[in-house]
């Protein structure tokens, strides 16, 4: 049986593509391939990952130029047909700019770049990305971003909550949602959301940086495992 192909998109300025490739390659029966930003070829990928970094130098606005790349034209079209797409950090920003997810990400409330471990809780374990998590567990997964402050109009937030599209929230070590546990000011402590169809997920924390013991946490590994078992 052939390995399942997972496409990892590479933009100019991506810097987590190799980390993501390494995490994906650690799963048996899964083969990561790099998808260059200037290509229209998804290479038969059964899922797409948009990794972290600073696509196109984050000029104008994080993710705003990447949305116009040839590869994103194909990703948007494929996502509309049900292809699973995961956006991590800058990848989340690209998903928002591309219209695959609702809302926007602005500068962190303290206007500083944040790079540290943080705690998040899966608040919806009934998705293709979170099926191996429990909703009462607390995950230790690092963040590294300057524009991670998620916001959207009240009616969008209400719709996200109503349709269980909020997937992760920032919490403290005990799993309590509070302003003190919110690293960047995101409305409702939102760390990750998905689309209405459930095949597109964006989150600011980096699961690929919490995917093996050597990194200090394996809490992010089950996100990839949850996705791959659905393919």
From Swiss-Prot:
Q: Which residues form the active site?
A: 89 (nucleophile), 206, 208
* Pathway(s) the chain acts in: Purine metabolism; IMP biosynthesis via de novo pathway; 5-amino-1-(5-phospho-D-ribosyl)imidazole from N(2)-formyl-N(1)-(5-phospho-D-ribosyl)glycinamide: step 1/2
State whether keyword Magnesium applies. Answer: no
Q: InterPro entries from the xrefs?
A: Class_I_gatase-like (IPR029062), PRibForGlyAmidine_synth_PurQ (IPR010075)
Q: Which GO terms describe its molecular function?
A: ATP binding; glutaminase activity; phosphoribosylformylglycinamidine synthase activity
Question: Does the UniProt entry include the keyword Hydrolase?
Answer: yes
Localization, per the record, is:
Cytoplasm
Give the primary localization class: cytoplasm
Q: Which reaction does it catalyse?
A: N(2)-formyl-N(1)-(5-phospho-beta-D-ribosyl)glycinamide + L-glutamine + ATP + H2O = 2-formamido-N(1)-(5-O-phospho-beta-D-ribosyl)acetamidine + L-glutamate + ADP + phosphate + H(+); L-glutamine + H2O = L-glutamate + NH4(+)
Ranges of residues in domain Glutamine amidotransferase type-1: 7-231
Any Gene Ontology CC annotation: cytoplasm
**One GO biological process from the UniProt record?**
'de novo' IMP biosynthetic process
**Record EC number:** 6.3.5.3, 3.5.1.2
Keywords, ordered alphabetically:
ATP-binding, Cytoplasm, Glutamine amidotransferase, Hydrolase, Ligase, Nucleotide-binding, Purine biosynthesis
Per the entry, what this protein does is: Part of the phosphoribosylformylglycinamidine synthase complex involved in the purines biosynthetic pathway. Catalyzes the ATP-dependent conversion of formylglycinamide ribonucleotide (FGAR) and glutamine to yield formylglycinamidine ribonucleotide (FGAM) and glutamate. The FGAM synthase complex is composed of three subunits. PurQ produces an ammonia molecule by converting glutamine to glutamate. PurL transfers the ammonia molecule to FGAR to form FGAM in an ATP-dependent manner.
Subunit structure, as described in the record: Part of the FGAM synthase complex composed of 1 PurL, 1 PurQ and 2 PurS subunits.
User: What is the official name of this protein in its record?
Assistant: Phosphoribosylformylglycinamidine synthase subunit PurQ
- Organism source for this protein? Chlorobium luteolum (strain DSM 273 / BCRC 81028 / 2530) (Pelodictyon luteolum)
């Amino acid at each position: 049986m052939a390995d399942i192909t997972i496409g990892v998109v590479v933009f100019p300025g991506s810097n987590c593509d190799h980390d993501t490739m390494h995490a994906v390659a650690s799963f048996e029966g899964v083969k990561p391939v790099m998808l260059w930003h200037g290509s229209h070829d998804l290479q038969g990928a059964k899922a797409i990952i948009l990794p972290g970094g600073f696509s196109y130098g984050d000029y104008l606005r994080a993710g705003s130029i990447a949305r116009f790349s040839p590869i994103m034209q194909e990703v948007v079209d494929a996502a509309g047909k049900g292809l699973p797409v995961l956006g991590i950090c800058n990848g989340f920003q690209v998903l928002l700019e591309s219209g695959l997810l609702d809302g926007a990400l602005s500068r962190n409330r303290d206007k500083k770049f944040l790079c540290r471990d943080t705690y998040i809780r899966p608040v919806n374990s009934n998705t293709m990305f979170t099926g191996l998590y429990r909703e009462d567990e607390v995950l230790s997964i690092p963040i590294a971003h300057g524009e991670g402050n998620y916001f959207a109009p009240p009616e969008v937030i209400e719709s996200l909550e109503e349709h269980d599209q909020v997937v992760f929230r920032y919490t403290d070590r005990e799993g309590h949602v509070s302003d003190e546990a919110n690293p960047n000011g995101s409305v409702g402590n939102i760390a990750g959301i998905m689309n209405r169809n459930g095949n597109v997920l964006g989150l600011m924390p980096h699961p690929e940086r919490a995917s093996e013991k050597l990194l200090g946490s394996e809490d992010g590994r089950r996100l990839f495992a949850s996705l791959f078992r659905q393919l």
